[in-house]
Amino acid sequence: MEYNTSALCDIYMDQVDVVEPMFSNFGGRASFAGQITTVKCFEDNALIRETLEQDGVGRVLLVDGGGSLRRALLDGELAAIAEENEWEGIVVYGCVREVDELEDMNIGIQALASIPVSAAMQGVGEVDVPVNFGGVTFLPEDYLYADTTGIILSQEPLSADLEEDEEEPELLD
């Protein structure tokens, strides 16, 4: 399904938080949405792998990597696991690598930047905790909507079928 964050903001402005514009698209899917699962880790992606091995239908993984630009928290192998388990998308407050592989995958991926250096795999971090970056506090089970324009967050699911919110014009005799 396609999502348009600009249209969603126009309709639901009082219900959404807008993440500061700092992310770039790296995945093959330009827009994505779902209920978030959070991982908070720093230069260590073991918990990301563990989480992506779960069923991801209707879910978006939100990774607070502390904004580190020194190591990539997501690579082609982890993105393939996410795609296989049907995750809608991944947002990384940090870096990714193997970007040519990422853009060929049917998953939405947004991150700060890319770097070729991989992360450690020691399992240090937390899952399903509130995280804060980009001027927004993300709570587990909030709903995230992302496209090439930006990322928005809502406590409740938003109707993506924007057509149904418009009234049909009355026909005059």
From Swiss-Prot:
It holds the Pfam family RraA-like. GO terms for cellular component: cytoplasm. Signal peptide: none annotated. GO terms for biological process: regulation of RNA metabolic process. It is found in: Cytoplasm. The keyword Cytoplasm applies. It comes from the Bacteria. Keywords: Cytoplasm. GO terms for molecular function: endoribonuclease inhibitor activity; enzyme binding. Its main location: cytoplasm. Globally modulates RNA abundance by binding to RNase E (Rne) and regulating its endonucleolytic activity. Can modulate Rne action in a substrate-dependent manner by altering the composition of the degradosome. Modulates RNA-binding and helicase activities of the degradosome. Homotrimer. Binds to both RNA-binding sites in the C-terminal region of Rne and to RhlB. Belongs to the RraA family. This is Regulator of ribonuclease activity A. It comes from Vibrio vulnificus (strain YJ016). The lineage of its organism: Bacteria, Pseudomonadati, Pseudomonadota, Gammaproteobacteria, Vibrionales. The gene is rraA.
